[in-house]
Amino acid sequence: MYDYLVVGAGISSAVFVHEALKVGKTCLVIDKRDHIAGNVFCEEIEGINVHKYGAHIFHTSIRRVWDYVNQFAEFNNYINSPVAIYKDELYNLPFNMNTFAQMWDDVRTPAQAKAKIAEQVAEAGIGEPSNLEEQALSLVGRDVYEKLIKGYTEKQWGRDCKDLPASIIKRLPCRFRFDNNYFNDRWQGIPMGGYTSMVQRMFGDVEIRLNTEYRDLIAAQPDIAKRVIYCGPIDEYYDYKLGRLEYRSLRFESELLDEENHQGNAVVNYTEREVPWTRIIEHKHFEYGEQPKTVITREYPADWQPGDEPYYPINDERNTALYEHYEKLAADEGRVIFAGRLGGYKYYDMDKAIDAAFDLVEQELGVKIG
């Protein structure tokens, strides 16, 4: 009998397993996919680490997280500086002085940019915003909204901005300096050699069974472990008996191109509604690759259906209430602990997922990290 059966071979599981092995616990890791590393899995194609489930850029201001991951990989100095394309016009992201100078010919200083935005906000004349469109207009005015927010957001959610709640956008940060660094965090980069190698080092020599369903294993060996760390969907664990939690999903189309450099940037967003994909990722630029070929991936938002890969929890009133009911069931579990993005029905950046795993390690193993 193992001390722990760990369901899911992603980054949260890897942290827990690494620490459990250090204190002498035995673990079995299973995953229904045919690979480890969850959604940060990278596949090498023509010497390029391809992010199979969308772009993953590591960024954090949590020192203990940064120190921890650097035990398992050397990180490069990649800075996320995406570009947006709207009707063949190029704009830097996030919204900063470069963006405003590209958008308005008469804007060159922070004072001019602030005045232009204030003028357009006043023209919109929004009192209390009743939907996402009104919220955005009340924050940044019509030009930024129409060119960089409206179409992209409608593709992401599959609904018109007038039909989306204002609460989705609580604020729209505008930087009144020439700074294209998307994140504000202290540390940022990509693990050299890809995320899969990093996660493999975290797991060490633990036993991992891929293409393995939790239900099948437990049906055959109900007493295989004393405790279960379950990083799968919490509603699936309970056979959806209270109802299904909802997600937004994604679809990816990757293409190997016989050219050295396709778009000159790792991430290019397409913000007009008429272009069906939301962005194109050119993976080699994450690691400053100079390979003779390149791999690009078009990313399409998708309505989630049972059986699809769940990406983003829809934390609206209905789903939040349903998750809380499942959480009450989970509180009565004797040996099962729910963890990770799917177990907790919560979207995590990678650093927050790792930090939450640290808390689990402390709670379950009595080991404090950092």
Feature map (PLM): residue ranges:
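C-terminal segments that line or cap access tunnels to active or ligand-binding sites in enzymes
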Residues: 236-370
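Dinucleotide-binding Rossmann-like beta1-alpha1 core, especially the glycine-rich loop
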Residues: 46-122
